[in-house]
Design a protein with these regions (language model features):
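Alpha-helical membrane segments of multi-pass proteins
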Residues: 1-312
Length: 312
């Protein structure tokens, strides 16, 4: 029940469903963030200070929702003309409403436009929910079990060249990697503009972690990891053991604590992102969940309990 509808609904099988599933999940996140922003605008009124805090979040979220929705529709239509069936018509309505919403975010903020944005959100949610009762054209095309489960045909027998060469990319991990590198770069640049230094080793560790992710999610290793357990475990353990260690060495929380501004520094009557970060770090459940004892329990459970019991 906690999974986004696009992940559990009409894009779960078929050719290229791996692209569509990742895109649908990203679109759901973007839609959620942007919808929350426009809802706050409506409930609290279009105040300049509030608008300045929310407008770019809303613009980016709505744009991500539109881009993800286009890929979902492309996959579901299975090369048929858009609008040639009821599912396609529903998807066009969703895309048009989202596109209008994107345009609205770039117009001068008024209460009427905020309400119009809420209306577009309502249309998207209602039509998306209703369209899950319809059958996408992709479902009507006969496909092999491999295509239905993986989103692509089984590749030939693996060789070193195939495994290490560029392969089928993973949109989700690529997006996370780009956001991680760009966000870190912006934070470091902000710090240096203030005349403060930041460790080159931290920068190298952080970028190195995401480079590993991009490489693993873009080569033949990723394709074979979805179909063969041995390659799956190689990719899985690299993700779980090497990447987190490099990310931690990048000291992202320390960087955020130094870069983010407090409410007093912004002086617009709201809590600043630094205040929110510190409140989260000092929250007792956070200290417990991210403490060494909880980390040890999770580590033991994730390996020994799963692999050495009937759960596996």
């Amino acid at each position: 029940a906690a999974l986004p509808v696009p992940v559990t609904g009409a894009i779960s099988v078929g050719l290229n469903h791996d692209f569509a599933t990742d895109s649908g999940a990203l679109a759901t996140i973007g839609m959620t963030v942007a919808a929350a922003c426009v809802l706050v605008e409506v409930l609290d009124g279009p105040r300049p200070a509030l608008t300045n805090r929310l407008i770019w979040k809303q613009r980016i979220g709505a744009a991500v929702a539109l881009a993800g929705g286009i890929i979902v529709t492309w996959q579901g239509q299975a090369e048929r003309s858009w609008g040639s069936d009821r599912w396609g018509v529903a998807r066009i309505i969703v895309l048009v409403a989202t596109a209008i919403w994107v345009v609205i975010t770039w117009l001068p903020r008024t209460r009427m436009l905020s309400w119009l944005g809420v209306t577009m959100v309502a249309i998207v949610l209602i039509v998306t929910g209703a369209s899950n009762q319809l059958i996408p054209p992709r479902y009507l095309i006969g496909q092999t079990p491999a295509v239905n489960y993986l989103g692509y045909e089984l590749p030939p027998a693996p060789t070193a060249a195939i495994l290490l060469a560029p392969g089928r990319p993973n949109i989700g991990f690529w997006t996370l990697s780009v956001l991680g590198i760009v966000g870190y770069y912006v934070a470091v640049r902000t710090l240096k503009r203030r005349g403060e230094a930041w460790s080159g080793a931290c920068i190298g560790s952080w970028i190195g972690a995401w480079v590993v992710v991009i490489y693993l999610a873009s080569t033949g290793l990723w394709e074979y990891s979805s179909m063969q357990f041995s390659w799956h475990m190689l990719v899985h353990m690299t993700f779980n053991m090497l990447v987190p260690a490099l990310l931690v060495l990048g000291a992202p929380i320390t960087l955020l604590r130094r870069v983010l501004r407090s409410g007093d520094q912004i002086n617009d009557g709201f809590n600043g992102p630094h205040d929110c970060l510190m409140a989260t770090l000092e929250w007792r459940p956070t200290k417990i969940l991210f403490g060494p004892f909880a980390a040890w329990i999770v580590f033991i459970a994730s390996f020994y309990v799963v692999y050495f019991t009937p759960i596996f």
